[in-house]
């Protein structure tokens, strides 16, 4: 992160922004939680850390004393904190488990809607989140509906397969069933700054995927075999949980579908809107007037079923995304539909 911030400052300076003043008063008012500032490891760039407040059940649709919990899952699914200015700094995997645990403790909650808007994420993070939802259903017997928003691809869709029912919006992008590992060769870029790497290693393949050189044939074969195994696991999970899906290679080649196409192929059970998911959950609970609540932090208010938590640092949004620069901060193999090589949805 420090390298990216420094790069951003240099980029801004060389672009002639020295005469422009950046006002921060509005940014401070947007910070979603109480924060304090510390120095980063090199003692130069500040980091903003938020104080974790307990999750609260915030009503987004009024009703009876019986509740339906709407759990929001947005953005890149990785097992790490997305900390920085303007971000709640949540770990998506940790937060998802925390919300499921709170739902399980609340005896007034009778059903769960998982609202997913995600390109996907790390192979392991996505798999863990799905397993957590499967375990939750096994322990509680509670009905679960997944509603896909703008994007329900890769690991985001993998998570949805753990639900009793999947609903997609008419314009949802569904699919991206595949595995990707992004590697970049920065040898020429480093040479422009007179930087050269010198690696001392014990083990022929221990530096496989290094940005300092291209892969050889053996290395490419090793990584491809791993990707294919992860992809086969993804396919097996879909086929086991979606009985109407046919084992057709054409639909498992990473392509994407509209909500209607996904329904025709059996990847989703219906096409509708979030109100339709709520109505279905109410039917499952036997209470057509059940209250709908979202679990958010005290400083992160939810007033409608569309409420989202800011979980991407403002500084990252202000900087150019350079392929390869984020590689060390992300998982390796990913269940993700990736239209952008920077992997920052």
Model-found features: residue ranges?
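N-terminal organellar transit peptides
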Residues: 2-4, 9-146, 151-152, 158, ...
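Active-site loop architecture of trypsin-fold serine endopeptidases
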Residues: 171-179
């Amino acid at each position: 992160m420090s390298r990216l911030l420094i790069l951003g400052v240099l980029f801004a300076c060389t672009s002639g922004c020295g005469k422009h003043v950046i006002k921060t008063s509005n940014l401070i008012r947007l910070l979603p939680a109480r924060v304090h500032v510390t120095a980063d490891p090199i003692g130069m760039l500040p980091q903003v850390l938020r104080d974790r407040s307990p999750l609260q059940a915030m009503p987004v649709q009024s009703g009876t004393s019986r509740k339906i919990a709407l759990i929001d899952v947005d953005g890149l699914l990785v097992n790490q904190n997305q900390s920085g200015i303007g971000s709640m700094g949540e770990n998506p995997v940790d937060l998802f488990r925390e919300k499921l645990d709170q739902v399980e403790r609340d005896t007034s909650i009778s059903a769960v809607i998982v609202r997913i808007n995600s390109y996907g994420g790390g192979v392991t993070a996505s798999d863990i989140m799905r397993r957590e939802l499967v375990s939750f259903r096994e322990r509680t017997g509670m009905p679960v509906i997944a509603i896909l928003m703008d994007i329900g691809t890769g690991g985001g869709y993998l998570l949805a397969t753990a639900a009793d029912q999947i609903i997609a919006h008419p314009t949802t992008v569904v699919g991206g069933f595949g595995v990707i590992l992004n590697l970049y060769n920065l040898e020429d870029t480093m040479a422009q700054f007179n930087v050269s790497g010198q690696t001392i290693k014990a083990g022929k393949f221990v530096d496989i995927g290094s940005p300092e050189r291209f892969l050889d044939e053996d290395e490419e074969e090793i990584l491809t075999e791993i990707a294919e195994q992860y992809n086969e696991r993804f396919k097996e999970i879909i086929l086991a949980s979606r009985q109407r899906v046919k084992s057709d290679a054409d639909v498992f080649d990473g392509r994407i579908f509209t909500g209607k196409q996904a329904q025709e192929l059996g990847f989703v059970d219906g096409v509708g809107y979030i109100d339709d998911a709520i109505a279905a959950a109410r039917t499952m609970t036997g209470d057509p007037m059940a209250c709908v609540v979202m679990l958010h932090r005290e400083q992160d208010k939810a007033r409608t079923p569309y409420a989202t938590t800011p979980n991407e640092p403002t500084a990252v949004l202000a900087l150019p995304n350079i392929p390869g620069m984020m590689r060390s901060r992300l998982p390796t193999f990913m269940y993700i539909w990736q239209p952008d090589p920077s992997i920052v949805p």
